[in-house]
């Protein structure tokens, strides 16, 4: 599996009050848009996305800008500064994964260094 192909999907995601509000208002379509945005952020450097780049995602999902904006700005799930956006929750859940990967990479480097001695 490529290094940027994994994203944890906690089964408790739907019990978060912000996500509950999203689903109650936007339905499963809104929930799907939320996860599509998380998937997009997952492959971005530092999990920070460019708002201008979302036009491609919008076309892929066949949604209107107004629907995308509701999910991005309406539920407190993303932090947007006008040019970029990120999900604090995604950063939080990826931290243990990144820490584990760093330990594995360090172990592999140490093992390779030991072989070269």
Would you name each region that the model predicts?
Residues 1-111:
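Detector for short helical micro-motifs
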Residues 111-117:
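Charged, low-complexity alpha-helical linker segments
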